[in-house]
């Protein structure tokens, strides 16, 4: 551990103190780019106020199997071996696009390296994506030709239920493109160990529940997508896409607990079974029309309708008498309908671009619920409207993007109706320092609506005298975020140092309260506020100036506080971290990933992020790729939760999936392409709300 920490500190020192001047990039510029580049004289990168633009040399293009391999080399992206998808080393949500249209992992795989022109990496997403993602990666490809691509990928553990599989095919003829995709992620673990403790005072007595449980749990997620595109260059683009998401999950748990009330000790038996499933069909229609050389109008409509079935049966009894302590039999049938519509217009001026639009999303949920309080029927409706406009341009050495929006959140349930309009401004400024360095500043303000589980009226028994429920009276949060970023890029280094500060008013906080019917309830409140500040250092170091050896690092010393509704101040300091070491040589590649989990605030609790200690490699032979790896070397995947000192209930939980310990993975993939497929520049990307299951 000491060696690991020393290595991390050494790399931090290298990032901060190393600089080099290299020759200027050769990316073409246009008079009316959305944001002109801050001058960074790097071979492969140009830094803009809200994004970085990457190109790739001949060696990188020849080694890559597909575009996904190229994107993986970006300094703040890494391959998640568990899901076999790309993610940000900084965490958060990453959205991938191909020529402006939202793309799946398989679509990125279907792009040959020779077709890649450049990659736009937005660490400050534009208005149309700002509410959906923390990072946006846009893959720009060359013009279309008639052709076809297809491929398949399968990865499986040798000693437990872990399978990732996918297949895709695309065919292009003239102005028409047809695409078909299928993916499956299966998990089936029979040895998850869970240790939980509840400790509290109630009615003058001291209670303690010490639980040990072994679960058999798993899930299967499948997706089928069919896509048709017609693109007429310089005129219009039409796309129709049908998605079908199929998801099932189950938990079968047995165990025991030691229940203590003052000096009385009882041995309890426990059982908990639960399951959930849904099938979600989604239709996505998109149309874009060039009204003139300077004007473009885009329309996007997305709709879905489906039913989610959720059951949970939990009981606890005294051993050996069999006397029941509690029985929790919950059955929830949820009918959910969602629709999203967006209209956007872009006008190009000599000085920059003006983008304006309107997006509306509406989700209606009808619930038939049988739980501890009996049977009930209730409906909720979540409506959100977003008007936005932003202008981007350049004045001398300053690059800027200034935006203003108006957001309406209207949440309605049987118990409460919440309606709020919020002004949502955003300012981004970029300034060239010299050579390969730049400074950027971004400031924004936006509301965040409560999620469906937080607003739910459902009640679930967690332990004797402990239940969990939502709060239909929650209001939206208001986040004010600021980032001041220093960037350095040369042949060996590509990193950002981000000084950040976030203030959230009416932060949604989970906490325990006294409940007259059940003892204590874990529920939600609008706390007064929260603050988070720190420095995030992220990027990559290439000691040889190529991909023979690459070290990627993310280190974030930070502090966070929550001021509860009763005035109590909760504080936590942490050092988030992530380390990736990779190597590429001819047809071989090898990667090692490591982190040290840290506790961060999550409502009334401190929770750790998922631990990682993975190594995996691949060998490429023409269209075939052979993969092998070991995940969670010497350790199970582990998740920890503990309550704060201010909590009425002292709670802790340690969750370990023993099946994952030193899990050996083997895989194979095949990817073939001939010609090029149709790609379009879609300006709008939307999706309906995820399934409500609480």
Model-derived regions: residue spans:
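Short, acidic, small-residue-rich periplasmic hinge/interaction motif at the N-terminus
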Residues: 20-60, 81-82, 122-123
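Flexible loop and strand-edge segments within Gram-negative outer membrane beta-barrel domains
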Residues: 23, 187-336, 448, 458-462, ...
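N-terminal periplasmic accessory domains that precede
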Residues: 37, 67-70, 86, 106, ...
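Short acidic/polar hinge/loop motifs at secondary-structure boundaries
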Residues: 73, 101-126
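Surface-exposed extracellular loop regions of Gram-negative outer-membrane beta-barrel proteins
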Residues: 133-134, 139-153, 252-256, 313, 410, 435-480, 501-519, 635-649, ...
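Outer membrane beta-barrel strand-and-loop segments of large Gram-negative receptors
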Residues: 338-340, 380, 386-388, 475, ...
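Outer-membrane beta-barrel signature, preferentially recognizing the C-terminal barrel domain
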Residues: 447-496, 503, 522-534, 542, ...
């Amino acid at each position: 551990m000491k060696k690991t920490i020393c290595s991390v500190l050494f790399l931090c020192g290298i990032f901060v103190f190393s600089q080099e001047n290299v020759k200027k990039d050769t990316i073409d510029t246009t008079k009316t780019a959305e944001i002109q580049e801050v001058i960074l004289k790097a071979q492969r990168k140009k830094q803009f106020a809200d994004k970085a633009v990457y190109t790739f040399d001949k060696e990188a293009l020849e080694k890559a199997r597909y575009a996904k391999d190229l994107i993986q080399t970006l300094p703040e992206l890494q391959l998640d071996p568990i899901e076999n998808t790309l993610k940000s080393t900084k965490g958060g949500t990453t959205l991938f696009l191909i020529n402006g249209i939202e793309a799946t992992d398989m679509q990125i795989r279907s792009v040959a390296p020779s077709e890649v022109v450049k990659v736009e990496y937005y660490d400050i997403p534009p208005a149309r994506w700002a509410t959906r993602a923390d990072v946006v990666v846009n893959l720009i490809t060359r013009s279309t030709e008639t052709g076809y691509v297809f491929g398949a990928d399968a990865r499986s553990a040798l000693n437990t239920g872990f399978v990732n599989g996918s297949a895709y095919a695309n065919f292009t003829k003239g102005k028409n493109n047809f695409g078909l995709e299928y993916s499956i992620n299966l998990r089936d673990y029979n040895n998850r160990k869970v240790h939980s403790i509840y400790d509290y005072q109630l009615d003058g007595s001291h209670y303690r529940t010490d639980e040990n449980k072994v679960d058999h749990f798993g899930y299967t997620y499948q997706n089928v997508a069919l896509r048709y595109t017609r693109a007429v260059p310089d005129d219009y683009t039409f796309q129709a896409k049908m998605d079908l998401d199929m998801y099932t999950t189950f938990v079968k748990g047995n165990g025991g607990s030691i229940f203590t009330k003052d000096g009385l000790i009882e041995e309890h038996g426990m059982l908990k079974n639960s399951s959930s499933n849904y099938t979600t069909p989604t239709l996505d229609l998109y149309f874009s029309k060039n009204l003139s050389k300077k004007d473009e109008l885009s329309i996007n409509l997305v709709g879905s309708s489906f039913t989610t079935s959720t059951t949970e049966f939990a009981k606890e009894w005294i051993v050996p008498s069999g006397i029941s302590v509690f029985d929790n039999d919950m059955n929830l049938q949820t009918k959910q309908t969602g629709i999203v519509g967006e209209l956007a217009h872009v006008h190009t001026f000599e000085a920059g671009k003006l983008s304006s639009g309107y997006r509306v999303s509406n989700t209606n949920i009808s619930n038939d619920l049988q739980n501890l309080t009996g049977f009930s029927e209730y409906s909720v409706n979540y409506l959100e409207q977003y008007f936005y406009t932003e202008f981007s341009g350049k004045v001398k050495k300053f690059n800027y993007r200034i935006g203003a929006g108006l957001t309406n959140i209207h949440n309605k349930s049987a118990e409460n109706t919440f309606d709020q309009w919020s002004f949502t401004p955003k300012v981004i400024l970029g300034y060239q320092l010299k050579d390969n360095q730049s400074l950027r500043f971004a400031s924004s303000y936006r509301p965040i609506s409560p999620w469906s589980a937080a607003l739910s009226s459902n009640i679930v028994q967690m332990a004797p005298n402990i239940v969990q429920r939502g709060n239909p009276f929650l209001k939206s949060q208001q986040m004010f975020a600021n980032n001041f970023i220093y960037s350095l890029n040369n042949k060996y280094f590509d990193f950002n140092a981000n000084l950040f500060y976030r203030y959230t008013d009416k932060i949604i906080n989970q906490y325990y309260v006294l409940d007259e019917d059940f003892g204590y309830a874990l529920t939600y409140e609008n706390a007064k506020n929260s603050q988070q500040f720190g420095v995030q250092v992220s990027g990559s170091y290439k000691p040889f100036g190529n991909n023979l050896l690459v070290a990627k690092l993310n280190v974030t010393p930070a502090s966070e506080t929550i001021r509860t509704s009763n005035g109590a101040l909760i504080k936590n300091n942490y050092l988030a971290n992530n380390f990736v070491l990779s190597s590429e040589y001819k047809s071989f590649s090898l990667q090692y990933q490591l982190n040290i989990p840290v506790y961060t605030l999550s409502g009334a609790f401190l929770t750790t992020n998922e631990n990682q200690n993975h190594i995996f490699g691949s060998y490429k032979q023409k269209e075939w790729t052979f993969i092998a790896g070991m995940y969670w070397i010497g350790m199970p995947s582990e998740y920890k939760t503990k309550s704060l000192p201010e909590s009425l209930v002292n709670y802790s939980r340690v969750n370990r999936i023993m099946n994952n310990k030193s899990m050996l993975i083997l895989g194979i993939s095949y990817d073939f392409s001939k010609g090029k497929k149709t790609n379009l520049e879609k300006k709008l990307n939307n999706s309906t709300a995820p399934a409500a299951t609480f």
